[in-house]
Amino acid sequence: MKVLSLLPRSRFTESGMTLPETLSLHFLPPNGSHVLIAAAESAQALLLPPSQPYVDAFCLERMPSIRFIRTTGAGFDSVDHLTAAELGIPVSNSPNMNASSVAEYVMAAIVNLQRGLAWADGEIRRGRYAASRAELLEQGGLELRGCRIGLFGLGNIGRAVVPLAKAFGCSVAACDAFWPEEFAAENGVERMDVAELFAECDVVSLHCPLNGSTRNLVDYNLLSSMKPHALLINAARSGVVVEADLARILAEGRIRGAALDCFADDGRAENPFLSIPAERVLLTPHLAGVTRAAFGRMLSQALENLERVLVHGQPPRFVVNGVLADYSD
């Protein structure tokens, strides 16, 4: 059974994965639509990264042999899943496989920004030991204990943050349209609406999908309601935040800082955050969920699901676009 993978073979070898003999994986670097369409000829499935590159309607409509699409992350915005649904192609993701890795990133980012760690390291390497120490002493480092952490989204990743935040002595509030009553009660998570979350929490960490209701949700008005010492952590999707508004808020000193694991400009010169001092903003290249352990779990789950569909003729697990096709021959 031919599976076209837009993940490199190295991802499997680095994770210690042995490719199953029942599947014939063909690895394709991201080379554009026409190359992808040609390579997908006779393939039964696509194995995709969670966010990039994007497989659009143009490609999907020209891949008649594709029966199943599997992403390797909680996100599934690397594919036009609505068009896939119209074509009867199920799209599955990998829920909860990297939740602990992302949660660890969130806590590390908070501590880094509250204490200016990455900035101080850079300043010392530029010969500014005394000056950087004086600046940090004047600004005053913040202690995480006693802070209120606000989670916008209380799914698998948001829930993984809760015990870590509690271990640091923080209280936790959250906003989620699908409120997990039992989990929240058992773990002492306070329910807030989005306006309360941004206005009342010391840290707001985004853990929501990118969809019509969340795109550009975090704008200037919402950001300007945050406390002056507050932090914004975005390890979700760049489109949730109006980046020009966040850059303006940071430049004006309206909040203490932000950690961005995803942003639209991908580090190019026009990225508005590159001109903001590292003391105020931490930029990382979408690696919050990228650990060897997480990749191993995601890839193992993805391969099991591919075998389930293509080899055993069973319906896929973790379908995100509502397509439940019959795979029995």
What residues fall within each predicted segment?
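Conserved beta-strand positions in the Rossmann-like core of class I SAM-dependent methyltransferases
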Residues: 173
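A short, aliphatic-rich alpha-helical micro-motif
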Residues: 36-41, 60-63, 144, 196-201, ...
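Rossmann-like adenosine-cofactor binding region
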Residues: 54-56, 177-273
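N-terminal Rossmann-fold NAD(P) dinucleotide-binding loop
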Residues: 158-159
